[in-house]
């Protein structure tokens, strides 16, 4: 059964930039405040929608610190740390832990169209990141091109203590969510809908307890999810 801790609307914060390409730090704070004011249950940062692929390592660290410190515990912050390198992903996870961040989100390891982790490598990366001691959401997104079969996800949930949540936004998302919830039982604490909520109703019927879309209309999505 899904944990009531992981439910509701958890939008992805966009990253604002100035006209010269620099991060707009004050704008980032306003983005955070806007979402908190809309009573969201949590906020995700540095995700694909947040332009993560345009950010340098230094900019990522600046944003991680700024967002977690500015939210200041008002809602949980999920920090995306996806990387092909397990060492880099683990380093990012440790920073989040040091800053008091509540959650991490990760896609499986991939690079480009052809470099993809095997099921064992995927498991090992998540297991290593789990050693940082921060709750992990697995992002099953089509962007990675990596297949994450339900048995693998359930194995991760059962054997990696910090893997608790699953954002399912691949093709046939509702069917996958249903299988994950039914077969994983109590180990699937946070089954989430994603991909801009285009399958939201089907995903909720399948057992999703939360939604993670962009930050455009959380005030409209939240009442539907709850």
Residue ranges with predicted function:
Residues 2-145:
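Active-site beta->alpha loop and helix N-cap motifs at the rims of alpha/beta catalytic domains
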Residues 132, 142-226:
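Catalytic alpha/beta core domains of metabolic enzymes, predominantly
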């Amino acid at each position: 059964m899904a944990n009531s801790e992981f439910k509701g609307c958890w939008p992805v914060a966009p990253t604002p930039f100035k006209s010269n390409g620099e991060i707009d730090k004050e704008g980032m704070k306003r983005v955070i405040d806007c979402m908190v004011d809309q009573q969201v249950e949590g906020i995700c940062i540095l995700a694909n929608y947040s332009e993560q692929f345009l950010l340098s390592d230094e900019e990522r660290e600046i944003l991680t610190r700024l967002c977690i410190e500015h939210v200041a515990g008002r809602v949980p912050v999920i920090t995306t740390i996806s990387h092909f390198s397990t060492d880099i992903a683990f380093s990012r996870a440790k920073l989040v832990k040091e800053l008091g961040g509540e959650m991490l989100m990760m896609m499986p390891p991939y690079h480009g169209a052809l470099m993809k982790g095997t099921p064992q490598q995927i498991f090992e990366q998540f297991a290593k990141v789990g050693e940082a001691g921060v709750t992990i959401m697995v992002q099953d997104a089509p962007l990675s091109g990596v297949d994450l079969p339900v048995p693998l996800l359930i194995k991760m949930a059962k054997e990696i203590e910090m893997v608790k949540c699953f954002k399912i936004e691949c093709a046939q998302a509702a069917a996958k969510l249903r299988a994950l919830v039914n077969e994983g039982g109590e180990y699937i604490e946070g089954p989430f809908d994603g991909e801009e909520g285009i399958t939201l109703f089907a995903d909720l019927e399948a057992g999703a307890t939360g939604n993670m879309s962009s930050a455009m209309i959380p005030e409209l999505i939240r009442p539907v999810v709850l």
